[in-house]
Structures are given as structure tokens and as C-alpha cells.
């Protein structure tokens, strides 16, 4: 049919190859195609420190080489020394000290002198006055008529209250304890309106404390029959029945339950 040596018209494709696996030494690894963040082996970048601090760190680390953290850089300690104070701080402290000294030295200037002192009054003008009159010569002249009026009203109200209390005293019994007149008057008014004491409410017809005629005991037929049986009753047949129940009707010989009781004829 054709020649034994046939050549394909299309070129053959190369074998598929993964780009991620191409750089892996062993492509059979289960995690060969997974890209990972490379581990940074190099030391972390340290901030650039001035030469003075570096020298101080070296001096601090040199005396004790047995420290377990000898190569680790630490925050340098603050060198203890006299810190120069700021000029503003000095000025403020001086101002505060001066203000405090002035306030302590002159306490009388801070207090206003509104009233004249005792030794400022001219007492030599009128030697006949007493010391109280000399201290307060204007006390009687400055009394207001309103204050006098209020004092009179207070006295009148006190007198009226005392009179009302005196009028209430005779109505009370000497043996009973004292109580306010308003409470007693209220109790009396309530008793008059009700017409009976509050305890009589419990003795009404509907209360369980009182016995009515319906609740009284009545003689029952059964109790009478029991009494008759104990004393002895003559039956219709003419026989005498005793309390022991020895005699009974001939038709009740077989009845053991009713041998102690007789039949009642209605």
C-alpha cells in the first residue's frame, strides 16, 4: 500500500514538564510543587547605633563573658548623672517660691477688714456706758419692726398651742396612757358611725364562731334505738329483747350479722 518508511507530517511535541518541579532535586516529593517562603538564615538587620553607645555596650559585655546572652544587643541603659535642669523649670520654681513666701509673710492683707476692731473704737468719749453698750451702740437702733412683729406672732402661736393642749387634758382618763387627741377623736367618730365595736363583726350570722339552729345537735333515730336496745324493748311478737341479744326472731337464726339488733318497723 505505501512505503515502509513513513514520516509523520507534524513534528512530535516534547514531554510535558512542570516548571516548578524542574528545579527540585527529587520531583517525587509530595510537597515538591508547593512554593514556600525561604528561611532567612542571615541575622536580622540591627539599627545603626552611634559609636559612643557601641563602645558602652562593648564595655558592659566585656566584664562578664559568661553571660548566656553575650552576643545579643540590648537597649543601652541610661547613664545616671546630674541632668541639667531646664531654664523654664528654674523660673517657675522661683516664681512659686516667691509667691509662697509673700502669702506666708502677709496673712493680714489677704483678709478684708470690714468691721472695726475692739481697740479701734473710741471708748474715752462716754465713760459712763457699760462695755456691752460700748461694743454694740447701734444694736437697739437697728432692730427692724418686722422682726418685732414676727416675735409677737411666735408668742401668740405658742400660747394658742398650750391652750389647746390644756383643753384636751381633762377629757382623758388619768389611768389610760397619753395619746394624741386627733387619734382618739378619729376612733370615736368611727365607732359612732359603725354603731358597734369592731369585734362584733366576727359575731355575725355568717361567721363560723356562732352556732345556728341548723348546726345544733338533734336527737337521731339511731341513738334512740341504741338506747332502747340497751334498756330492753318488747317487739311485736311479744318477746323481750335484752342488751345481750339472747332472744331473737326464729327467722333470723341463720343471720349472724343482725343477731344483736332488731329490725325496725316503719
Curated annotation (Swiss-Prot):
Stretches the record annotates as F-box-like: 90-119
Compositional bias ranges of the Basic and acidic residues kind: 143-156, 250-259
Post-translational modification Phosphothreonine, affected residues: 37, 75, 200, 210
Pathway(s) annotated for this protein in UniProt: Protein modification; protein ubiquitination
GO cellular component term, pick one: cytosol
UniProtKB keywords: Cell cycle, Cell division, Cytoplasm, Mitosis, Phosphoprotein, Ubl conjugation, Ubl conjugation pathway
SS bond list: none
Superkingdom of this protein's organism: Eukaryota
Record bears the keyword Metal-binding: no
Region listing for Disordered, in residue ranges: 1-84, 120-225, 242-266
GO BP annotations listed: cell division; protein ubiquitination
KEN box, short sequence motif: residues: 256-258
Residues annotated with Phosphoserine modification: 29, 31, 44, 67, 93, 197, 207
Post-translational modification: Ubiquitinated and degraded by the APC/C-Cdh1 complex.
Cellular localization per UniProt: Cytoplasm, Cytosol
Subunit-level organization: Interacts with SKP1. Part of a SCF (SKP1-cullin-F-box) protein ligase complex.
Biological role: F-box-like protein which is required for entry into mitosis. Acts by participating in E3 ligase complexes that mediate the ubiquitination and degradation of WEE1 kinase at G2/M phase.
Domains (record comment): The KEN box is required for the association with the APC/C-Cdh1 complex.
Protein name: Cell division cycle-associated protein 3
Gene: Cdca3
